[in-house]
Amino acid sequence: GGYQSASIGALERFVADYALQKGLETPDLGESVDAKVAVIGSGPAGLTASADLARLGHEVTIYEALHKPGGVLLYGIPEFRLPKQILETEVEYIRKLGVKIQTNVVVGKTVTLNDLFDQGYKAVFAGIGAGSPYFLGVPGENLNGVYSANEFLTRINLMNAYLFPKYDTPIILGETVVIMGGGN
């Protein structure tokens, strides 16, 4: 008796805050292996793969469709859960590893996979996330004011709703709110 569960979220937050205060040292990188790798998406998978590949000596470029890197870490997690400064510090650390980040590039439209291989990339990692919601097919789900979790969080986080009333967010809020599912 007398034992309590560990609060993983609080521990992760402590470590992130500590690293933010103390600064992250850029490790020695592996010997260059002369292989270019393109990473599609700058969410958790893309950032992690990019950092690991850079540490192994690969030349890495991230292609991000949005105007800022971070993917779901940026648009899907509210400021009170993941302060943007922590994400910005992590992205800067990855840049210090030599990773290049190109934003506003939609792979498949702006540039194709064949274009990437023609540019000398030996491999492509697709960390594109799960951006498409699953709808239930219920009457009214296509009406104004009905949002998927990702759409709602994107509008909140990318349109600065957390800085309300300085910024007004184009989200229709009704008197009644229904939340279906427990993911986001």
Where do the model's predicted regions map?
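Iron-sulfur (Fe-S) cluster-binding segments and ferredoxin-like electron-carrier domains
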Residues: 1-17
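Residues forming the flavin
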Residues: 12-184
